[in-house]
A protein has these predicted regions:
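Domain-start "cap" segments at the beginnings of catalytic or binding domains
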Residues: 1-13
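Amphipathic alpha-helical interaction surfaces in cytosolic regulatory modules
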Residues: 11-28, 34-37, 43-89
């Protein structure tokens, strides 16, 4: 399983905005991701809330390659708690 740990400034606890999500994907994920197997995307513990706009922007590049079904089957989300993880997955 490929593991990708996202990085944000320590003071950043909430993520929002479609363009910001796209930027994070392009800068931290796009050049290293391989869709050949399962992928674990790890949000740092300081992240408390992730808006649907960020989720949609971040995952738009992934969905374009493997589709929503591929995201459901291949992508595992790890965050500070199960509620946040469920929220991120729901907002894809």
């Amino acid at each position: 399983m490929m593991k990708i740990s996202l990085e944000f400034p320590k003071s950043e606890t909430r993520l929002a905005g479609f363009p910001y999500g796209e930027t994070v994907y392009k800068e931290q994920v796009k050049n290293i991701i391989s869709f050949d197997g399962d992928i674990e995307i790890i949000f740092p513990n300081q992240i408390e809330k992730v808006a649907s706009s960020f989720v949609q922007g971040f995952f738009s590049g992934i969905v374009a390659v493997i589709g929503y079904k591929g995201v459901e089957e291949q992508i595992k989300i790890v965050s500070r708690n199960d509620n946040l993880t469920a929220s991120i997955r729901k907002n894809m």
